[in-house]
């Protein structure tokens, strides 16, 4: 099992798909990495030579921000938005959608489960 950027890649998957298990690498980035390193995208991870795995590891370390570094950068970006008090930062702080989606209905993923407000009975 190849280990790249602290992630164990599944050995039965094609290289193109297995690289997407690394946070920060999607399919287009995986294709670009494989093209740059000269590794066949259809090769299974278990069939890669040690030299090819090292090539992939070196390329990813030098040219791509992945895993912990990328997560830290995203968290710092959100923290900066919150600190400067811009609209996007306020939306993050309140746990509401940030990119202009409607909130009168929907937005349940960001808002969480419904909090039902019952009518009060008159005595």
Swiss-Prot record:
Annotated Gene Ontology cellular component terms: cytosol; small ribosomal subunit
Top-level taxon of the source organism: Bacteria
Pfam families: Ribosomal_S13
GO BP: translation
UniProt region (Disordered), positions on chain: 96-123
InterPro entries with a match to the protein in the record: Rbsml_uS13_C, Ribosomal_uS13, Ribosomal_uS13-like_H2TH, Ribosomal_uS13_bac-type, Ribosomal_uS13_CS
Keywords: Ribonucleoprotein, Ribosomal protein, RNA-binding, rRNA-binding, tRNA-binding
Keyword Transmembrane in record: no
Keyword Transmembrane helix among UniProt keywords: no
Disulphides: none
Molecular-function GO terms, alphabetical: rRNA binding; structural constituent of ribosome; tRNA binding
Family membership: Belongs to the universal ribosomal protein uS13 family.
General function of this protein: Located at the top of the head of the 30S subunit, it contacts several helices of the 16S rRNA. In the 70S ribosome it contacts the 23S rRNA (bridge B1a) and protein L5 of the 50S subunit (bridge B1b), connecting the 2 subunits; these bridges are implicated in subunit movement. Contacts the tRNAs in the A and P-sites.
HAMAP family: Ribosomal_uS13
Assembly description: Part of the 30S ribosomal subunit. Forms a loose heterodimer with protein S19. Forms two bridges to the 50S subunit in the 70S ribosome.
Name used for this protein in its record: Small ribosomal subunit protein uS13
Organism lineage: Bacteria, Bacillati, Bacillota, Clostridia, Eubacteriales
């Amino acid at each position: 099992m190849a280990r790249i950027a602290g992630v164990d890649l599944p050995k039965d998957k094609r290289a193109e798909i297995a690289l997407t298990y690394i946070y920060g690498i999607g399919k287009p980035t995986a294709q670009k990495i494989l093209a740059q390193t000269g590794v066949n995208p259809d090769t299974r991870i278990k069939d890669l030579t040690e030299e090819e795995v090292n090539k992939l590891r070196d390329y990813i370390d030098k040219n791509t921000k992945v895993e912990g570094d990328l997560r830290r950068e995203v968290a710092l970006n959100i923290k900066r938005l919150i600190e400067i008090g811009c609209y996007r930062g306020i939306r993050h702080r309140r746990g509401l959608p940030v990119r202009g989606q409607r909130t009168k209905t929907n937005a349940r993923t960001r808002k969480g489960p419904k909090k039902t407000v019952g009518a009060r009975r008159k005595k």
